[in-house]
Curated annotation (Swiss-Prot):
Residues 14-62 are annotated as: Disordered. GO terms for molecular function: small GTPase binding. Interacts with YIPF6; this interaction may stabilize YIPF1. May also form a ternary complex with YIPF2 and YIPF6. It holds the Pfam family Yip1. Keywords: Endosome, Glycoprotein, Golgi apparatus, Membrane, Transmembrane, Transmembrane helix. It comes from Pongo abelii (Sumatran orangutan). Signal peptide: none annotated. Residues 1-119, 184-200, 249-256 are cytoplasmic. It is a multi-pass membrane protein. The chain crosses the membrane at residues 120-140, 163-183, 201-221, 228-248, 257-277. This is Protein YIPF1. Residues 15-29 have a biased composition (Polar residues). It is found in: Golgi apparatus, cis-Golgi network membrane; Golgi apparatus, trans-Golgi network membrane; Late endosome membrane.
Length: 306
């Protein structure tokens, strides 16, 4: 049985003094939790992976995505299932709109703004606002072009609202659907680093159309040069958002396939903007010419001269 003296605790005031007295004693170093160990075992990260993280903006997206995956999903036939697609606040919507207007080179729009919570609230109302902006601005533009003509009578063209709605919503849903199917097909052939869901692609396309709302309002200016400059600015901003977002999803594919995909995305976006400008704003110069009626005296004079 151990002696009583062996069970007594001894208080060590100075570790250095104790080590001097017992040089062969075993020491244990407990590091402070806030300090980073100087030496860590493990292989360093490759430069390629660091490039992917920098391009995709992977700061805290893994944690957010993990927490988002823990949410319980309701059946698709219930109202709660679709309610989750509109579960965003004003700050998130404004932040995503700002991201679509100020694209950051080398950063991914999905990873920075959408990945944690893709929504349909922003894309739905952006498309609705764009529809009315194009239709109303197109009517006002036609009115200003013919303003001052005695024979011109303004008639509102309400059919432009339905045409604009069909065009905008078809583009905002059918093009993402086709792109999502294409990416899924290519992902089965080539293991890509990045994959997007259908809702994420719809979200990207919806927010990328926001720049066309102020552009459509400024298209009222009856100057073709100004209109085309506005088209190029809007196309450059929104097209760069789409290109930088979807390039990481196709860059591991065949080089020609990747470039053809990005070029197709930009060309379809250009076709939408140019088509809207040409149809809704570039009206014919004169749809009707002033008609003149001949008086009886003029008819008699013409008969005598012949």
């Amino acid at each position: 049985m151990a002696a009583v003296d062996d069970l007594q605790f001894e208080e060590f005031g100075n570790a250095a003094t104790s080590l001097t007295a017992n040089p062969d004693a075993t020491t244990v170093n407990i590091e402070d939790p806030g300090e980073t160990p100087k030496h860590q075992s493990g292989s360093p990260r490759g430069s390629g992976r660091e490039e992917d993280d920098e391009l995709l903006g992977n700061d805290d997206s893994d944690k957010t995505e993990l927490l988002a995956g823990q949410k319980k999903s309701s059946p698709f036939w219930t109202f709660e299932y679709y309610q989750t697609f509109f579960d965003v606040d004003t700050y998130q919507v404004f932040d995503r709109i700002k991201g679509s207007l100020l694209p950051i080179p080398g950063k991914n729009f999905v990873r920075l703004y959408i990945r944690s919570n893709p929504d349909l609230y922003g894309p739905f109302w952006i498309c609705a606002t764009l529809v009315f902006a194009i239709a109303i601005s197109g009517n006002l533009s036609n009115f200003l072009i013919h303003l001052g003509e005695k024979t011109y009578r303004y008639v509102p063209e309400f059919r432009k609202v339905s045409i604009a709605a069909t065009t905008i919503y078809a583009y905002a849903w059918l093009v993402p659907l086709a792109l999502w199917g294409f990416l899924m097909w290519r992902n089965s052939k080539v293991m890509n680093i990045v994959s997007y869901s259908f809702l994420e692609i719809v979200c990207v396309y919806g927010y990328s159309l926001f720049i066309y709302i102020p552009t459509a309002i400024l298209w009222i200016i009856p100057q073709k040069a100004v209109r085309w400059i506005l088209v190029m600015i809007a196309l450059g901003i929104s097209g760069s958002v789409l290109a930088m977002t979807f390039w990481p999803a196709v860059r591991e594919d065949n080089r020609r396939v990747a470039l053809a995909t990005i070029v197709t995305i930009v060309l379809l976006h250009m076709l939408l903007s140019v088509g809207c400008l040409a149809y809704f704003f570039d009206a014919p110069e004169m749809d009707h010419l002033p008609t003149t009626t001949a008086t009886p005296n003029q008819t008699v004079a013409a008969a005598k001269s012949s």
